[in-house]
């Protein structure tokens, strides 16, 4: 049972390698080695900071590094320098060795055994540097530093080296696509072969049931050994391992005669079609078996030598459909050891884009391919054995089934053609020729034709002919298709000489005239010729000889005849063309005798007029005659006198001055023979019957303020003669306010403006030409403004003519800021002059949908409040006054509001609370009762009077008290202190007792120093104080002496 298998590339590990110089100039490598060592010395000295982290080990040149597993190598991004590569490896704990290859820094993690393998490149551009880090020196799977010379001393055959295929993917320091691009670029550069150190062979199962494109594989799943190989060119090199013999010799393992077989490289292209050249035999080399003590993987087990097998898949195979099967055989030059067999693995490398097919025997020596589609297929066969590996390539080209060619068919159009001079050019089309593939060549050849200087021969699809001469031509068209098949056909062309046909004379149709007409014009310009007429000649036919006639223009196309008489005239026209050919034509003119009939007069239909129409027209233009009417005459034959006829001698006359009655007017017409005819017309004039006009006004009008204009339509009024005047009047009971615009009260439509609330009644009077009139009545109802109570008016300090639309918009915007609403929410209803220098603006404020209108008194109060808080110049115009349009003050229910002054008019016995008006909101009111104010005022006045009297009395009592003056005398030391209280002359005043003076009293009396009098003169005169001896006046009791403290109080 077949299974669809996919052939995938073998995921062997790979590594980059540089250019390998194929020169024996050792001094160049020595110079490069010296330069590199010098750079590392400078690098070591300039990186003291990193010296504590890692130390430089030995450096190996011409040696590369290969990963034994996955993700042990990674490429440092960018274009680093050698110093930055070394520093990066030191800073990375996973980096133990780095490989410097032509400006690329490849770092490696070789901390695990079998993770890294070294191989020799023999290129001075390849350098491997070991770094000594903490606890990592023993873990490296490389050769000891002392064993480096063993690798450098190997004798390699450079001519047999090949670049090793990739076996291990680098760590993804860069993107996978970039790595693959870089790898392919390095692989194309071509470098010498490399030697791979042996590794331990690992086994893994490979699932052979994977799909590859459209190919299917039959067979069962097999288990193969995954063997690491060095290159596809069968080079088997084994490097000397540490501890092994230093002398290595290369032993060819192929028979004689094959050692000199040249090796060819596989040629691959990135295009769709790729060609792979099979790899012939290449020499194989082997070296000494390594010792078990030293290996790159730090293992004691010996590594087997991989033997390179020379594999051939045969020559390239090419088949052509319908054959779609092919068999590929793989051949191995070396025979397998006894008891062993080779395993085969066929892989599809290159294939066409949309391909399909089946593979059978994918893991056998013979691969059978079937059901292949056209295209190029490249197969690779991998042969593996015990410690042996080889590859071979072969191409299979499947060509499409060859097409069976059909010869083309030559087609010319037209096949037969005839032209006449002066036409001397034409074309013959051969592009309609057909072929099953493609016509690649057209060839025209003139087979037959008149004698000329040069025959026609062209290689175009369309044959263009010119300067042809009269004669018969035969042209041959030969077409060639893409396969070389041909076909021919012919085309015939006849060129005739120019033909000059005789002219065709045309003298026109026969003519008939009647006397007295005796002249006519004949036209011969309808005569034709193919090349043109050169002359015309008119003549009288022999049958008309002897006729009297005058002829003019006998040598022109037009003949004028006159003075003809009654009879038949035959004229002959002779025309001549450019070569003298002539043609004739005849025309007959019949002159009939005169047959005159009298004219037919037609005065027109009767007419009926109604006064005041007193004029009309009389039309006789429909009168007729067989010849010609030469005169018209209008006359009044019946009717009242006093009429006037204008243009009475013409076909159309005008009658004026008609009166009530019946008139008869007669028309007389005459022809050239003085024959005449008459016709009459009646004109009836009736008295006027006037009907009075009818006045009609279209419906009543209802408007709602603030709309204050209206129009009344009286144009439907009618009259039989026409209305001559309209007059609109206002009823006496209508409001007097309102204006008539443009004197429209005398027009059919009345325009009114500035109407006020109320009902207007208007009367329309219409009058006709006779003075009769009619009237109609209508009303105009003006309803109050539903927003009247919410209207706010502002008196602005600006002339109304100076308030522009821009200033208005700015002012509305400022009002919106004060009220906290949008500009569109403020609807201005009216702007009108208030005084000569002020303007009144009326508006209302509504909110956003559903457009609810704010209360007018709240808006006015808010504006007043906000303006008090703002600066005086906040508005662009000073607001002189802000109020509602209608006065909405309740006047404390004791008065009414004056709509003009917007203030309260209080009822009797009530007055305004001026304190509230002045100190609070300033709103007029009628809160105070006059009676209460009078009582309160009286009480206040009385209280103030009492208070004033009390204050005055207190002040007077204070002023009426006598002041006590103390008189002191200086006493002798032996005298006693005494104080005499002098009696007053007033009766009824008690006298105070004497108070003895002492030194304390003397000091206390100094508080009232203004009243102290020192009476030194009394002492000098020897006068004694009253009561000095303790006596008291009669009738008085001695006062108790006060203590000094009481005296002070």
From Swiss-Prot:
It is a multi-pass membrane protein. InterPro entries: Ig-like_fold, KIAA0319-like, KIAA0319-like_C, MANSC_dom, PKD/Chitinase_dom, PKD_dom, PKD_dom_sf. Residues 234-277, 1022-1049 are annotated as: Disordered. PROSITE patterns: MANSC, PKD. Its main location: membrane. The keyword Transmembrane helix applies. The modification Phosphoserine is found at residues 978, 1009, 1031. Glycans are attached at residues 247, 395, 487. The modification Phosphothreonine is found at residues 974, 1037. GO terms for cellular component: cytoplasmic vesicle; Golgi membrane; nucleolus; plasma membrane; trans-Golgi network. Keywords: Cell membrane, Glycoprotein, Golgi apparatus, Membrane, Phosphoprotein, Repeat, Transmembrane, Transmembrane helix. Residues 1028-1037 have a biased composition (Polar residues). It is found in: Cytoplasmic granule membrane; Golgi apparatus membrane; Golgi apparatus, trans-Golgi network membrane; Cell membrane. N-glycosylated. Residues 49-127 form the MANSC domain. Residues 51-932 are extracellular. GO terms for biological process: flagellated sperm motility; neuron migration; proacrosomal vesicle fusion; receptor-mediated endocytosis of virus by host cell; response to auditory stimulus. Residues 310-401, 409-498, 504-594, 600-688, 694-785 form the PKD domain. The chain crosses the membrane at residues 30-50, 933-953. Residues 1-29, 954-1049 are cytoplasmic. Possible role in axon guidance through interaction with RTN4R. Interacts with RTN4R. This is Dyslexia-associated protein KIAA0319-like protein.
